């Protein structure tokens, strides 16, 4: 797929030279979009996100704020009642709290990349809370104990593919909250 634009490059960044200069040569852009990052006070801040086969890039406009290596992920918590999700990370300063109407696409890409690296499924937790702030490990908590995590221990653990697709091989995703439908085909579902 190198040199080709991903069907999920919603911001058309795969051909942007300034953006590509932040990404290593062996990375493929698989997803780009606007996303809401929740700050320490849980206010939404608009960010651009890039997901490659190796990392997640959080950009403010087009300036790189953080690169999260896929290898740093230890799990993802999602809300059953909102588009919120938390990326639980090891060896980083804190967890990352995001919200996106395209959360299912993001989860699919991240889980496929994680499985390609570790040959195992990424942990997925689903909670009824609309706001997941209680499950975000803060910088202060990590400074006290680097291995500390607020990742749920007694929550409903889901098989990520079952959550994403059930028994379906296709799902329709509303693109840009309009009437334009994007058919998303998934491979190797199990």
Regions from the language model: what does each represent?
Residues 82-163:
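Eukaryotic regulatory low-complexity N-terminal regions enriched in Ser/Thr, Pro, acidic
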Residues 34-84, 88-104, 166:
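Phosphoinositide-binding peripheral membrane targeting modules
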Residues 1-48:
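Anionic N-terminal interaction surfaces
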Residues 6, 147-149, 169-171, 178:
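Intrinsically disordered, low-complexity serine/threonine-rich segments
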Residues 9-11, 35, 136, 164, ...:
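Intrinsically disordered, low-complexity regions of eukaryotic proteins
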Residues 13-16, 21, 47, 54, ...:
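Intrinsically disordered, low-complexity proline-rich segments enriched in Ser/Thr
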């Amino acid at each position: 797929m190198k040199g080709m634009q991903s069907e999920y490059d919603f911001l058309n960044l795969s051909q942007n030279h300034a953006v590509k200069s932040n990404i290593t040569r062996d990375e493929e852009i698989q997803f780009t979009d606007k996303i809401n990052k929740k700050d320490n006070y849980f206010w939404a801040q608009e960010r651009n996100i890039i997901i490659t086969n190796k990392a997640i890039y959080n950009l403010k406009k087009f300036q790189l704020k953080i690169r999260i290596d896929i290898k740093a992920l230890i799990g993802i918590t999602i809300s059953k009642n909102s588009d919120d999700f938390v990326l639980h990370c090891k060896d980083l300063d804190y967890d990352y709290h995001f919200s996106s109407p395209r959360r299912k696409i993001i989860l699919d890409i991240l889980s496929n990349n994680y499985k390609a690296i570790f040959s195992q499924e990424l942990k997925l937790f689903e909670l009824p809370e609309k706001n997941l702030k209680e499950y975000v490990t803060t910088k202060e908590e990590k400074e006290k104990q680097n291995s500390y995590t607020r990742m749920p221990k007694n929550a409903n653990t889901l098989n990520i593919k079952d959550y994403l697709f059930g028994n379906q091989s296709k799902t329709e995703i509303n693109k840009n909250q309009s009437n334009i439908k994007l058919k998303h085909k998934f491979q190797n579902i199990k």
